[in-house]
Each structure stands twice: as C-alpha cells, then as structure tokens.
Amino acid sequence: MKNPIIDNIPCVLLAGGKSSRFTINNIQINKALMPLKSYSSLLEYQYTRLLKLFKQVIISAKKSYELNAPYLLEKESGLFSPLFGIHNAFLTLQTPYIFFIPIDAPLVSFESIKALCGIENFSVVYAKSPTKEHYLISLWHKSTLNALNYTLKTQNYRLSDLVKNTSSVAIHFNQEEEFLNLNTLKDYELAVQILKKRANG
C-alpha cells in the first residue's frame, strides 16, 4: 500500500447538497446513497478513493451517514450552499489550505487533483474544463475567510462572485469527461458506463 501522497492538505468532500435534480420515477433521491462500482454508495466510493490520495478526508454534510468517517456538520439546515461547508471547514480544521471536491464529481483524476494541490500563492485554485469552471473542485487558502464571512452575512451565495473577488487562478484541463457532475440520473448512468469502460481497459 502506497503512502498517501498529500499529507499537508486535508480534503473535504462536500456532501451537503440538495440533490434537487436527481429523481427516479419523479421521486427525489439522495444521490450520496446511490451505489457505485462495488461500493454501497457514492459517498463510500468517493471517501475510499480520496483516502488513497489524501492522508485526511472529511465529509461535510447536513447530517452524518452510516459510513464510518469524520464529518463536519453544516448547521444551516434549511439553506443549501457549499459556502457553508467551506466556511465551516476553515473554522474547524484551522489549516492554511483545504482541497474541496463535491460528492457528485467521482471521475476527477488523481493527476488533476495533484495539479490543483501543487499551486500555492493564490486564495483559490480551481479547475476549468473546456466548457465550464468548476469552482468546487478547488484548493482554497484560509485568506478567503473574510470574504466567506462577508458573503454569508450578505447572503450572496453565488460562488463565482466570491471566487472572482479573491486572488484566484483557473487551471485548464482538456478532459471534459472527468469533470462530469452527477446532477441527474442520466449523468449517474453515464458515470457508471465510464467507470466500467475504464475498468476494462
């Protein structure tokens, strides 16, 4: 077993979302609990996978799940914004840098994550694929704390506004596929196919 490669930056898995577009037969499903590969849930898949790269992986969620893992609980029960999870992570973990990744981005390669974690001197280092910015697949520095405080106070939950008002940098990646977000059942089915294809060769 290789030693985890990144031991100076914790990884926070953002799992406090609403899954509002993830429906099966018009019933809203919590996508964190959808099975993936041989794992009982997307949550378990992501947590187990990221532990191969990071020494410390913590799940940010509204409530803890059955999965035995460290959790950061978001106290704002009725409000859904990843900014609460990011803000809470900095207040709790007290580390200069934290890498964030959403639970519903299971295809991001370790190479891409390492590239993002290898760049310092910016408040936010985020991934950009050919068609969009991925502000939540990103390395954040604690210098964003004041901006986060202000954003939450003024209730402007637009992530892009916050990131663009900090010293941020986009790292460009050519692969669209690895940044697939599992927003819908269709996205989930596509990810299952991609993972199958990867396993076969």
From Swiss-Prot:
Q: Which gene encodes it?
A: mobA
Protein's name in the database? Molybdenum cofactor guanylyltransferase
Q: Family assignment? A: Belongs to the MobA family.
Q: Which PANTHER family match?
A: MOLYBDENUM COFACTOR GUANYLYLTRANSFERASE
Q: What is its main location?
A: cytoplasm
GO molecular function annotation: GTP binding; metal ion binding; molybdenum cofactor guanylyltransferase activity
The function of this protein is: Transfers a GMP moiety from GTP to Mo-molybdopterin (Mo-MPT) cofactor (Moco or molybdenum cofactor) to form Mo-molybdopterin guanine dinucleotide (Mo-MGD) cofactor.
Q: What is its EC number?
A: 2.7.7.77
Q: Which UniProt keywords apply?
A: Cytoplasm, GTP-binding, Magnesium, Metal-binding, Molybdenum cofactor biosynthesis, Nucleotide-binding, Transferase
